Design a protein with these regions (language model features):
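Phosphate-binding loop of NTP-binding sites
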Residues: 24, 62-65, 78-232, 236-247
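N-terminal leader/targeting and accessory segments in enzymes
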Residues: 1-99, 103
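Active-site regions of enzymes building and remodeling cell-envelope glycoconjugates
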Residues: 49-55, 243-254
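Short, glycine/serine-rich, charged loops/turns that create anion-binding
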Residues: 14, 37, 129, 155, ...
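Single conserved hydrophobic/aromatic residue that forms the stacking wall/gate
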Residues: 255-265
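Conserved functional loop/turn residues at catalytic and ligand-binding sites
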Residues: 27, 191, 261
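Short, polar loop motifs at secondary-structure junctions
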Residues: 35-39, 58-59, 180-181, 232-236, ...
Length: 265
């Protein structure tokens, strides 16, 4: 973000508002747009960021030339929403189009470089079961005596939680992130130490454009060395085991459960 000190935030839901605050706190001028002429809590945000410029409705692609980065909220498709022309123009110009999780991932890397903070990151995705698995994983980690924060699609948003815990000195040992395909689509820097892909069934095709693009977004949860937990009963999940060292792949099944090993007396 060196070309310009101006950024464009598309969508002023919870993630967009958090991103706007984040950018403003780093000295950037924030342009913000929303499909609604008066999104909830806009007045509050404008009081927090006095020089915030708000645009209601579609954004002219011309405005992209003024900014160095575009942040798009997860509910807005980069390709099929009213903001698609602006996103297309940004990509054409080589301007990064990111989501809130990408900002979270960047800040983690910055914190590690500056302070050595290196928490374990657990990612959870899948068409169904994300929230339940996220909550169970968080409870198990807490029961083991580790400090842990659950965030992401389950709420609250990860960037906001990172900012909050950094300010009060309570950064956790673990982050458990529920990640939707929408969030993963605009994420490049996140490195999960472990991640679960529970299942992939047809969903959100109107947002992604095709089943193939939807599945590809889900698989972005994995880095090359991420420990993967996959569902043996789901072909879409198991595709993520292909070409991966066996020690990085763990599978589960709720249908075919092996008999427990019995000890001989």
């Amino acid at each position: 973000m060196s070309v310009s000190q101006k950024v464009l935030v598309l969508g002023l839901g919870a993630s967009g508002r958090t991103a706007a605050r984040f950018y403003a706190s780093r000295g950037f001028e924030v342009l913000a747009a929303d499909t609604r002429p008066q999104p909830p809590r806009l007045d509050e945000l404008q009081k927090e960021i006095p020089n915030l410029k708000f645009l209601g409705g579609a954004v002219s692609p011309v405005i992209v030339a003024e900014v160095s980065e575009v942040m798009i909220s997860p509910g807005l498709s980069p390709e099929y929403s009213v903001f698609a022309p602006a996103v297309k123009e940004a990509k054409h110009r080589g301007i990064a189009v990111v989501g809130e999780i990408e900002l979270f991932a960047r800040e983690l890397k910055k914190l590690k470089a500056e302070t050595g903070y290196a928490p374990k990151i657990i990612g959870i995705t899948g068409t169904n079961g994300k929230t339940t698995t996220t909550m169970l994983s968080t409870a198990i980690i807490a029961e083991a005596g580790k400090s842990v924060v659950a965030a992401g699609n389950v709420g609250p948003n990860a960037l906001g939680e990172l900012e909050k815990h950094r300010q009060v000195g309570t950064l956790p040992d673990f982050w458990v992130l529920e990640l939707s395909s929408f969030q993963l689509e605009t994420t490049e820097s996140l490195h999960c130490d472990g991640a679960a892909l529970l299942n992939i069934t047809e969903d959100h095709i109107d947002w992604h454009g095709s089943m193939e693009k939807y599945a590809a977004a889900k698989r972005k949860i994995f880095s090359a060395d991420t420990v993967r937990v996959l569902n043996r009963e789901d072909p879409g999940s198991m595709l993520s085991a292909e070409g991966v060292p066996s020690d990085l792949v763990h599978t589960l099944s709720l249908i075919h459960i092996s008999e427990p090993t019995r000890r001989t007396p």
